[in-house]
Amino acid sequence: MQIWSAEIKELNQIYQSVKGKHTKLEKELQSLIKTDDANILLVYSRRCLEVIITDICEIELKRHRGTEPLQRIIDKLNKEEIVPHNIIVSMQNVNSMSTFGAHPKEFELKQVKPVLSNLDTIINWYIKYRDIKVEGIELKKDKKQKIISGERKKSKRKEVVIASTLTM
């Protein structure tokens, strides 16, 4: 049993929920959950991230990703506040750690766990973002609202400040 078996179990549940709804992500997740090789897990984690970022790039930035480095697109999504900051951090972590799988660099097996955990966080956010039906529940996305978390917190804060100034 690998030290990342719990993370693979979580990703397998996600795989089951996206089956038939997002073929590119499904393909990469299927390969990821079937392997127990640490290098291959890192490679397929990055490939899952690439599928997600390429899709977001086409939807939000209205262009194809092309050959632009993944990190540059992550930075752009962060700068333009398209993706919530906590998801950006997870994307950066998966992107940087997954290079160990693609290149002959040394890494500790326990470093694979946080990559898979971050990928789980990213994909769960992405499922909500893409309005994919999960377990029979269709999640809606409001285009004007920053996706899934971003501006909700800010708008509530503004309401509290406005309400407190009105009561003075």
Regions found by a protein language model. Give the residues of each.
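Amphipathic alpha-helical interface elements
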Residues: M1-S164, M168
